[in-house]
Amino acid sequence: MSYNVRAAIIGGTGLYSLEGMELIEEIFPDTPWGKPSDKIKIGKYKGKLIAFLPRHGIGHFLSPPEVPNHANICALKQLGVEEIVAFSSVGSLREEIKPLDFVLPSQIIDRTRFRNSTYFGNGVVAHAPFAEPFSPNLSKRIAQTAKKIGLEIHLDKTLVCMEGPLFSTKAESHLYRSWGADIINMTVLPEAKLAREAEIAYQMICMSTDYDCWREGEESVTVEMVIANLTKNAETAKKLLSELIHVLGNGDDLSLKNSTRYSIITAPEKRNSETVKKLRVLFPEYF
């Protein structure tokens, strides 16, 4: 791929395109992990060259466990992407996080069960640090932009990622609250883990659509409820992104550069050649 796109937007449920984007090209590349969720749009948005990828595909045909996260992140990495802002609907586990509120999580609890969450294994072992799963630098820029446009946004919250595709039971919802989790979704993992391994700064912007199913007297979450509230939030999300775009992809967060080099532990002579061949697409300088 001949582009050098430094910032990417991953759209979640309800966000399948970027209104106002001047399209240059759509690409649907092959990667060693297959094809991405859908065609990646490359274009200018408010004068900035960016990539846009709908996580669930246009028309929402991929459930959370089916999203080809390895291919998605690899394809964006090959474009030159250094920063990803990902959007997601979430359920609220806290009274103060109301439907239609925006949230910037800083921590994740992994409750997925069947998802491969790494590019490594199969003869090449690596252990990347993940204590801070989101980019503090990128999060700060998003928070500052939200303040600039007068958008209240909840900061430093804990996001629990469940397997899905079914929503939580009441017992699970109360359990996550007892753990200190604030919001819940099905898509931040392995997306955030793979972005970390790929040395891409990553932050998810979460939009609360419901109170999950823990709140007495409140209707439990439904797809209709999620879509209705995402539609209401569309204009606010667009306003935030139209300002945020100016502070993305400017080389402000290179803290992950070369970090994966020092996570690889397998001796060179013991590395599986087929795995090395795949990893070389992501990390040509390391293999």
Swiss-Prot record:
Stated name of the protein: S-methyl-5'-thioadenosine phosphorylase
Pathway as given in its UniProt record: Amino-acid biosynthesis; L-methionine biosynthesis via salvage pathway; S-methyl-5-thio-alpha-D-ribose 1-phosphate from S-methyl-5'-thioadenosine (phosphorylase route): step 1/1
HAMAP family for this protein: MTAP
InterPro entries cross-referenced by the UniProt entry: MTAP, Nucleoside_phosphorylase_d, Nucleoside_phosphorylase_sf, Purine_phosphorylase-2_CS
Pfam families, per database record: PNP_UDP_1
Residues the entry annotates as binding substrate: 186, 210-212
Source organism superkingdom: Bacteria
NCBIfam families linked: MTAP
PANTHER family from the UniProt entry: S-METHYL-5'-THIOADENOSINE PHOSPHORYLASE
GO annotation, biological process: L-methionine salvage from methylthioadenosine; purine ribonucleoside salvage
CDD domains registered for this protein in UniProt: MTAP_SsMTAPII_like_MTIP (cd09010)
Binding site for phosphate: 13, 55-56, 187
Enzyme Commission number(s) of this protein: 2.4.2.28
Record-stated family: Belongs to the PNP/MTAP phosphorylase family. MTAP subfamily.
Function according to Swiss-Prot or TrEMBL: Catalyzes the reversible phosphorylation of S-methyl-5'-thioadenosine (MTA) to adenine and 5-methylthioribose-1-phosphate. Involved in the breakdown of MTA, a major by-product of polyamine biosynthesis. Responsible for the first step in the methionine salvage pathway after MTA has been generated from S-adenosylmethionine. Has broad substrate specificity with 6-aminopurine nucleosides as preferred substrates.
Alphabetic keyword roster: Glycosyltransferase, Purine salvage, Transferase
Site (Important for substrate specificity): 168, 223
Organism, scientific name: Leptospira interrogans serogroup Icterohaemorrhagiae serovar Lai (strain 56601)
GO cellular component terms given for this protein: cytosol
Catalytic reaction annotation: S-methyl-5'-thioadenosine + phosphate = 5-(methylsulfanyl)-alpha-D-ribose 1-phosphate + adenine
Top-level EC class: transferase
GO MF, one annotated term: S-methyl-5-thioadenosine phosphorylase activity
Subunit structure comment from the entry: Homohexamer. Dimer of a homotrimer.
